[in-house]
Amino acid sequence: MTTSYAKIEITGTLTVLTGLQIGAGDGFSAIGAVDKPVVRDPLSRLPMIPGTSLKGKVRTLLSRQYGADTETFYRKPNEDHAHIRRLFGDTEEYMTGRLVFRDTKLTNKDDLEARGAKTLTEVKFENAINRVTAKANLRQMERVIPGSEFAFSLVYEVSFGTPGEEQKASLPSSDEIIEDFNAIARGLKLLELDYLGGSGTRGYGQVKFSNLKARAAVGALDGSLLEKLNHELAAV
């Protein structure tokens, strides 16, 4: 199946379909400044998507689905289904998850500018009205513009053992790896049907994954297994 140690990299494109707002924090803002700026790469100043945002959202969505399947409500991450903890980790068991979500960088800046984009973000004005006093509260929300494409990268580590078991000196079976990739594909599909970032119930944060492909980045992987893993990803 594999060598004694392996890392499988999943790459693809994450496309923003509706304005994306992943905030850079609630620090001090000068009068007239945007209330909620987006997070940016500190060097290029281009918009980025933190791996923490992707990991947290996918884990939450998968936990809900596993809970619905087993009629269980998981109140805390450490109470998640064993399969979820195997992929994302368990702090109480001191177990690192098999998945590593990378920060994603904008890749089509030149294309967006060629298509007429003056800036890579937009400022959307929103107004909350107090029902009692009718007082307005105008807010400025910075959003990554639709059509922005980001280089998606996720690393799956072939590791040992599962939550609640002793760490065994044996690699997971091919069936277990395929099961994990099925869960990864379902998590990404659930994200497409949900939203990333804030204000998703108001239309923000719809995204789409494309060109997903798995490859053996470290170690050897049987060709037939790799084909099956890519078949799972094709379902997204």
Curated annotation (Swiss-Prot):
Keywords: Antiviral defense, Endonuclease, Hydrolase, Nuclease, RNA-binding. Disruption phenotype: Deletion of the entire CRISPR-Cas locus (cas6 to cas2, Rv2824c to Rv2816c) decreases resistance to plasmids encoding spacer elements about 6-fold. GO terms for molecular function: endonuclease activity; RNA binding. GO terms for biological process: defense response to virus. Belongs to the CRISPR-associated Csm3 family. Part of the Csm effector complex that includes Cas10, Csm2, Csm3, Csm4 and Csm5. CRISPR (clustered regularly interspaced short palindromic repeat) is an adaptive immune system that provides protection against mobile genetic elements (viruses, transposable elements and conjugative plasmids). CRISPR clusters contain spacers, sequences complementary to antecedent mobile elements, and target invading nucleic acids. CRISPR clusters are transcribed and processed into CRISPR RNA (crRNA). This subunit has the target ssRNA endonuclease activity; it cleaves multiple sites in the target RNA at 6 nucleotide intervals. This is CRISPR system Cms endoribonuclease Csm3. It comes from Mycobacterium tuberculosis (strain ATCC 25618 / H37Rv). The gene is csm3.
